[in-house]
């Protein structure tokens, strides 16, 4: 296996056999369908397991990575050192009044569905974002003029000392694709959003409209991590890339989408290196043509 075999045995005291694996290919866990193995991957089923895992990692100085739905992640071909903590089994959603509370691993589409079923409007923007609520808080995810900062009420997080604390909207410091969670390395375990009462039919119509727009404009038929680049101030990344003649540009199995130039996709059989090489070429070309720096929105992690 790897250098963390002894640590794997320690973690095994907290997990059932099916909830802890070694050398798990990250290509099976992220939307891009690329990436080498995680030394250890755990899927906690309660908060206690999360806290115990974090405490052990910190006590033994073992690196860890928090994984939501894997929709905004690019894992390098060498995989991930240490422990990947995947939150997909922590996905409970509850509603009370105008508030929806979801565990970190709950999918945004399911939170959106819960809001719809309770005639709550304001979360339609997230219906097609393929991430989890924890990841959405982490990066202040958004689409179609909406973002988490518009609806978040509070979040429960685990801080750097493994203490659970409640953060208000203001304390979360949500900015463009950033948050205090990202800056300080906190772990989101639950989030509450506050919405407005609405009519089921109009909420459903908006969800359907946004879904149709997404399907018509984005290359959803290919593995990707969604929008590859952050929006540079005063520009649109996709237009800069298209105007640079890079639509369809490819290296190996990775390519700039023909459908939307802001997406780098896996056409089939891509390696993480292929994707990274395409990203680097796009950044270099746009810089040369327009003197604009493109920064990745997708998180790039792992070993070369």
From Swiss-Prot:
Cofactor(s) listed: FAD
UniProt subcellular location: Cytoplasm
Gene3D superfamilies named in the record: 3.30.465.10, UDP-N-acetylenolpyruvoylglucosamine reductase, C-terminal domain (3.90.78.10), Uridine Diphospho-n-acetylenolpyruvylglucosamine Reductase, domain 2 (3.30.43.10)
EC numbers for this chain: 1.3.1.98
Keyword field contains Cell cycle: yes
Pathway entry: Cell wall biogenesis; peptidoglycan biosynthesis
A Gene Ontology term for the protein's cellular component: cytosol
Predominant subcellular localization, coarse grouping: cytoplasm
Example of a GO MF term: UDP-N-acetylmuramate dehydrogenase activity
Catalytic activity: UDP-N-acetyl-alpha-D-muramate + NADP(+) = UDP-N-acetyl-3-O-(1-carboxyvinyl)-alpha-D-glucosamine + NADPH + H(+)
Keyword list, A-Z: Cell cycle, Cell division, Cell shape, Cell wall biogenesis/degradation, Cytoplasm, FAD, Flavoprotein, NADP, Oxidoreductase, Peptidoglycan synthesis
Single Gene Ontology BP annotation: cell division
Stored InterPro entries: FAD-bd_PCMH, FAD-bd_PCMH-like_sf, FAD-bd_PCMH_sub1, FAD-bd_PCMH_sub2, MurB, MurB_C, MurB_C_sf, Oxid_FAD_bind_N
The UniProt record lists the keyword Cytoplasm: yes
Highest rank taxon of the organism: Bacteria
Active site: 177, 227 (proton donor), 297
Enzyme class: oxidoreductase
FAD-binding PCMH-type domain: residues covered: 33-198
PANTHER family in the cross-refs: UDP-N-ACETYLENOLPYRUVOYLGLUCOSAMINE REDUCTASE
Protein family according to the UniProt entry: Belongs to the MurB family.
Function: Cell wall formation.
HAMAP family assigned to the protein according to its UniProt record, in alphabetical order: MurB
Protein name in the entry: UDP-N-acetylenolpyruvoylglucosamine reductase
Gene: murB
């Amino acid at each position: 296996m790897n250098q963390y075999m002894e640590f794997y045995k320690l973690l095994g005291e907290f997990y059932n056999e099916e909830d802890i694996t070694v050398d798990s290919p990250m290509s099976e866990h992220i939307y891009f369908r690329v990436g080498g193995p995680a030394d250890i991957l755990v899927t906690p089923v309660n908060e206690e397991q999360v806290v115990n895992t974090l405490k052990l990692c910190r006590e033994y100085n073992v690196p860890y990575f928090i994984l939501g739905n894997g929709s905004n992640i690019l894992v390098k071909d060498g995989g991930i050192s240490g422990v990947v903590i995947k939150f997909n089994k922590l996905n409970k959603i509850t509603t009370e009044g105008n508030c929806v509370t979801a565990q970190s691993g709950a999918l945004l589409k399911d939170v959106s569905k819960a809001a719809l079923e309770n005639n709550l409007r304001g979360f339609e923007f997230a219906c097609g974002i393929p991430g989890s609520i924890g990841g959405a808080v982490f990066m202040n995810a958004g689409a179609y003029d909406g973002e988490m900062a518009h609806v978040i009420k509070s979040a429960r997080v685990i801080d750097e000392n493994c203490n659970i604390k409640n953060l208000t909207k203001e304390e979360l410091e949500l900015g463009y694709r950033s948050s205090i969670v990202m800056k300080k390395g906190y772990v989101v375990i639950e989030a509450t959003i506050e919405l407005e009462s609405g009519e089921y039919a109009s909420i459903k119509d908006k969800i359907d409209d946004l879904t149709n727009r997404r399907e018509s404009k984005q290359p959803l038929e290919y593995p990707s991590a969604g929008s590859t680049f952050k929006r540079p101030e005063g520009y649109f990344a996709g237009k800069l890339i298209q105007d640079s003649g890079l639509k369809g540009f490819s290296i190996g199995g990775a390519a700039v989408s023909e459908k939307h130039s802001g997406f780098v996709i896996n056409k089939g059989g891509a390696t993480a290196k292929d994707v990274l090489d395409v990203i680097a070429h796009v950044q270099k070309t746009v810089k040369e043509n327009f003197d604009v720096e493109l920064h990745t929105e997708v998180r790039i992690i792992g070993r070369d």
